[in-house]
Amino acid sequence: MDYLLMIFSLLFVACQGAPETAVLGAELSAVGENGGEKPTPSPPWRLRRSKRCSCSSLMDKECVYFCHLDIIWVNTPEHVVPYGLGSPRSKRALENLLPTKATDRENRCQCASQKDKKCWNFCQAGKELRAEDIMEKDWNNHKKGKDCSKLGKKCIYQQLVRGRKIRRSSEEHLRQTRSETMRNSVKSSFHDPKLKGKPSRERYVTHNRAHW
């Protein structure tokens, strides 16, 4: 009697474990067919961040901070990467730009929208700073010239003439840069719809018949 109970219990346990072993065998066979490779994870979704403007040089930290707002610096094992600088500009953003000229390449940066007056003023101010730096460098190079104390009056006269020419050309270049900056700011203000004035309506003067 005891043997019969033991046999029935073993058969009952074997019947319950058969489906589980079948499922486990199917999973092992699928893993064997794939060669034991793990499924490749999908690439992470990259965030795109709109830029206010594009700097002519990424070494200009002030321009980078102004143009690329809320930059997150991601520390990777290889190098430190500025997040958001490499996103390409859309075609619709390029359509808002003014037609570029050869002189625009000297700007500190290029705004993404012509309606952003603060951005235009910031980018155009870089030309004035660059002109002042050129003027100061030329004047310092002139001061570092040869010593004319032992060469006579002719050398001193030549240095004076050269210094006046350098100063005159530098001041003229600075004046042209400032006038161009003002012209571009006026152009950007004309493109701003808020600053455009409404067309003036003609006012007709009506005379009172009592004064005729």
From Swiss-Prot:
Coiled coil: none annotated. Residues 168-181, 189-205 have a biased composition (Basic and acidic residues). Keywords: Cleavage on pair of basic residues, Disease variant, Disulfide bond, Secreted, Signal, Vasoactive, Vasoconstrictor. Transmembrane segments: none annotated. It is found in: Secreted. Changing K198N: May be correlated with HDL cholesterol levels is some populations and in a sex-specific manner. One of its GO terms (molecular function) is hormone activity. Disulfide bonds join C53-C67, C55-C63. One of its GO terms (cellular component) is extracellular region. InterPro entries: Endothelin (IPR020475), Endothelin_toxin_CS (IPR019764), Endothln-like_toxin (IPR001928). Residues 18-50, 74-212 form a propeptide. Residues 168-212 are annotated as: Disordered. Residues 1-17 form the signal peptide. It is linked to Question mark ears, isolated: An auricular abnormality characterized by a cleft between the lobule and the lower part of the helix, sometimes accompanied by a prominent or deficient upper part of the helix, shallow skin dimple on the posterior surface of the ear, or transposition of the ear lobe/antitragus. Auriculocondylar syndrome 3: An autosomal recessive form of auriculocondylar syndrome, a craniofacial malformation syndrome characterized by variable mandibular anomalies, including mild to severe micrognathia, temporomandibular joint ankylosis, cleft palate, and a characteristic ear malformation that consists of separation of the lobule from the external ear, giving the appearance of a question mark (question-mark ear). Other frequently described features include prominent cheeks, cupped and posteriorly rotated ears, preauricular tags, and microstomia. Belongs to the endothelin/sarafotoxin family. Endothelins are endothelium-derived vasoconstrictor peptides. Probable ligand for G-protein coupled receptors EDNRA and EDNRB which activates PTK2B, BCAR1, BCAR3 and, GTPases RAP1 and RHOA cascade in glomerular mesangial cells. Also binds the DEAR/FBXW7-AS1 receptor. Promotes mesenteric arterial wall remodeling via activation of ROCK signaling and subsequent colocalization of NFATC3 with F-actin filaments. NFATC3 then translocates to the nucleus where it subsequently promotes the transcription of the smooth muscle hypertrophy and differentiation marker ACTA2. This is Endothelin-1.
